[in-house]
A protein has these predicted regions:
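Long, low-complexity, charge-biased intrinsically disordered regions
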Residues: 1-363
Length: 363
């Protein structure tokens, strides 16, 4: 979406109907049918299509669709095999890459004329309701093209997903006579999860903790960066959660109820950064002294650059000995392409370091 806005390209999406059933089975499979087949009961049926439920059906459909994209001239990228690219040219002669992004049976096409490109896929696969349209929802997130300061910017928000998750949890709590707490921040002030000595949960509540963390993790994937750190911390206790950990998960949902809206703007503009500190002065000298043989490693078989260039920026930080029991630190980072966040992450470090300097070098 960043590249689309940056290069003046359009987006179109489609959903393949009965996706697996379009692909041939990759294994020799058969079944002995039951009474529901009438006179054929007890007969041996040979399975020729990648039926839902077969272990290899997902791989069979993926390979079948990949073959179609390859015939169209698209090439799978080295970094992500489900991102396909093809060199395109605008009427004015400007070169760019067309992209097709695949997530199981969801297709997203980025091109100057995406309907023509995605229509070639439709020649072999039937789309649900024969619909090819700009994306509105993708994997639970609402996608919109908005104007900001005279620039078209793609956005994604998890508002609908969050509201549905909160409402579902409130219904479950209502059956127990409980309510979500009102919260102004994701985690209660002063709560230290590793020092919590409340009772351990039974099997039922243990499963509830795992389910709630799964729901929250997907909300993070859809842009709720503001709860990433807190959910990461509580995820450490999924093996043996306590009552206090469950209550803190309720606290996070209470925070989401109070703050359901958060929109990420994938701004294609290049950030204004002062890099002179790395080019001259004492900092540059220090880097040269410590990394005198350092060279930029570029991937092999890189495709020819086409379209406008982008700048990748990473912001990184780590605590030191934040865990009061293990003395382990916690790492967090956000990676931007131009001014659009694309990756955000928070995790506990696997080893213990003696200084803040060393903890900043670990993931």
């Amino acid at each position: 979406m960043i590249l689309a806005a940056l290069n003046g390209l359009d987006l179109q999406a489609a959903d393949i109907e009965n996706a697996y059933l379009t692909a041939p089975c990759r294994e020799k499979c058969y079944t002995i049918v039951g009474q529901e087949f009438g006179d054929d009961c007890g007969s041996i049926f040979i399975i020729t299509k990648a039926l839902y439920g077969l272990r290899s059906s997902g791989a069979a459909f993926r390979a079948f669709l990949a073959g179609r994209l390859d015939i169209m001239g698209f090439k799978s990228s080295i970094v992500d095999p489900d991102v396909w690219l093809w060199p395109g040219t605008k009427p004015d002669g400007e070169e760019y890459y067309e992209y097709i992004l695949v997530y199981v049976d969801d297709i997203l096409c980025i091109s100057y004329k995406p309907k023509e490109t995605i229509g070639k896929i439709q020649e072999r696969f039937k789309f649900k309701k024969d619909k090819i349209a700009p994306p509105d929802f993708y994997l639970g997130g609402k996608v919109q093209l908005k104007g900001l300061n005279g620039i078209n910017i793609w956005t994604i928000t998890s508002t609908d997903y969050v509201k549905a998750a909160v409402e579902n949890l409130e219904k479950q709590l209502g059956k127990k006579g409980l309510k979500l707490p009102s919260a102004v921040q994701p985690m209660a002030t002063g709560f230290v999860p590793e020092l919590d000595d409340s009772p351990e949960l039974d099997a039922g509540d243990h499963t509830t903790v795992q389910e709630l963390i799964g729901i929250l993790r997907w909300a993070i994937e859809l842009g709720r960066v503001d709860i990433c750190h807190e959910v990461s911390i509580l995820s450490q206790f999924q093996a043996s959660p306590r009552q206090g950990h469950l209550e803190q998960l309720y606290h996070i949902f209470g925070f989401l109820k109070k703050n359901p809206k958060l929109t990420l703007y994938f701004d294609p503009n290049e950030p204004k950064l002062d890099e002179s500190v790395f080019e001259n002065g004492s900092t540059a000298k220090d880097f040269k002294e410590q990394y005198q043989d350092a060279e930029e490693e570029l991937p092999t078989h890189m495709p020819k650059p086409r379209g406008k260039a982008v700048r990748i920026t990473a912001f990184f930080d780590a605590s030191h000995a934040a865990n009061k029991v293990t003395r382990r630190s916690h790492t967090g980072f956000v990676i931007f392409v131009n001014r659009a966040p694309i990756i955000w992450y928070s995790k506990r470090q696997n080893t213990v370091k003696a200084s803040t300097f060393l903890s900043d070098f670990l993931l």
